[in-house]
Swiss-Prot record:
Protein name: DNA replication and repair protein RecF
InterPro entries, alphabetized: AAA+_ATPase, DNA-binding_RecF, P-loop_NTPase, RecF/RecN/SMC_N, RecF_2
PANTHER family attached to this UniProt entry: DNA REPLICATION AND REPAIR PROTEIN RECF
GO molecular function, one term: ATP binding
Keyword terms of this UniProt record: ATP-binding, Cytoplasm, DNA damage, DNA repair, DNA replication, DNA-binding, Nucleotide-binding, SOS response
Binding residue positions for ATP: 30-37
Coiled-coil boundaries: none
Pfam name, any one: SMC_N
Organism: Salinibacter ruber (strain DSM 13855 / M31)
Family statement: Belongs to the RecF family.
Length: 412
């Protein structure tokens, strides 16, 4: 599936913007601060109901607006697309609609159109704290299997309840009675063990995708691997029952510390992933180039993994992903975007120069949109030169469209 059209209303810099998108490369280019990243963020909201930044929903509402709304038409290239609309009202929350009917849960849309994001913040994936790497795994597995996301949400609720019991009795300077703590402990063990087991299975399957992705990006013969540091020294093929037994035993060993600190100290919320190139631990000893290459390989491997396990090609969002790449790796990625291995992509850049060969080679499959700030919003128009070339390719001879004929418009 692809995203055919996108409409933003009162979202970030966009008062009201509409986009007609091509089935392959869609280049959004313009000056910094023009609103390019906002477009990718809106697509991420539509696919996963949240931003790929750390920003809260209320900050995405345009100044002085009462809400924001994002709408997209999603479907196969030659089939009637469905209309997906997400609305957010501060104080009321988010709602999502498919063909006008509101879904019971926001989570029900996740996985409909899988999405993979490349951004400058990917450096945090290899250099940041463990939570960045857990978030990466959760993102992949939630899009691949809805049952994983449901289990994760139930686990978080159970952990919050267990922590409330621990905190309340910490204030009383007394251990919580078993009849209060034990039910939440058992629920935590059951749900947490399923999460750990699924992560183990995922990392075993993901290893081949990571090697393939790294090989495509870098010709250096380094072997990327991921070590999984979880509840205890579990065997990679540990059964769910074995994981439950170890989880329960680990909680028993930490019982006193948990009472003193008023929080759960064991579980998948403390998992760590260790990235290595051969024997080199990337987070501690990797060069900036190795960090950047490993992070890009992880995201490309994510694309391959979701591509194999979903009924549709993932959508690639690349936010200034080429800004710090050398010419050779930029060329490698552009070739990949143009190939049959990758479906639709939305790419932001400050200039269109590096993309000219791809844009000119297949004008029916690619599109260039220039994003310019205008009147406090982001005015989006097809690039005149590109539009002229596209029209010529389609009709043999045609003049460039005027601003009134633009396929993508933005208005206050």
């Amino acid at each position: 599936m692809i995203l055919h059209t996108l409409r933003l209303r009162s979202f970030r810099a966009h008062a009201e913007s509409e986009f007609d998108l091509a089935p392959s490369i869609n280049l959004l280019y313009g000056a910094n601060g023009a609103g390019k990243t906002n477009v990718l963020e809106a697509v991420h909201y539509l696919c996963l109901t949240k931003s790929f930044t750390a920003s809260r929903d209320r900050y995405a509402v345009r100044k002085d607006a009462p809400y924001f709304e994002i709408e997209g038409r999603i479907g196969q290239v030659r089939e009637e697309p469905m209309t997906v609309r997400l609305a957010y009202v501060p104080g009321e929350g988010k709602s999502i609609f498919v063909n006008g009917a509101e879904l019971d849960r926001l989570a029900d849309i996740v996985g409909t159109l899988p999405v993979v994001v490349f951004s400058p913040e990917d450096y945090d994936l290899t250099a940041g704290g463990p939570s960045e790497r857990r978030r990466f795994v959760n993102n992949i597995l939630s899009q691949a299997r809805s049952v994983y996301m449901e289990t994760l949400m139930k686990y978080r609720r159970a952990r919050r309840q267990r922590n409330e019991v621990l905190r309340s009795y910490k204030k009383r300077s007394a251990p919580p009675p078993d009849e209060l703590l034990a039910p939440w402990t058992e629920k935590l063990v059951g749900l947490g063990s399923r999460i750990v087991h699924r992560r183990q299975q995922f990392l075993q399957a993901f290893a081949d995708d990571l090697e393939e992705a790294y090989r495509r990006i870098d010709a250096v013969a380094e072997r990327p691997t991921i070590e999984y540091d979880t509840i205890a020294d579990l065997a990679p093929d540990a059964t769910p029952d074995a994981i439950e037994d170890e989880f329960r035993a680990a909680l028993a060993r930490k019982q006193g510390q948990e009472r003193d600190r008023g929080t759960t100290l064991v579980g998948p919320q403390r998992d760590e992933l260790v990235f290595r190139l051969d024997d080199l631990e990337v987070r501690r000893y990797g060069s900036q180039g190795q960090h950047r290459t490993f992070a890009m390989a992880l995201k490309l491997a994510q694309y391959f993994y979701l591509q194999q396990r979903n009924d549709t090609e993932p959508l690639l969002l690349l936010d200034d992903a080429f800004g710090k790449l050398d010419a050779e790796r930029t060329g490698v990625f552009l070739d990949l975007l143009r190939s049959d291995a990758v479906g639709q992509s939305l790419v932001t850049a400050t200039r269109r120069g590096p993309f000219e060969p791809a844009l000119n080679a297949e004008p029916a499959s690619h599109r260039a949109l220039q994003v310019r700030p205008g009147g406090g919003t982001a005015a989006v128009t097809p690039d005149p030169e590109y539009a002229r070339g596209e029209a010529t390719a389609a009709n043999g001879a045609a003049s460039a469209p005027t601003g009134a004929d633009a396929a993508s418009t933005s208005r206050d």
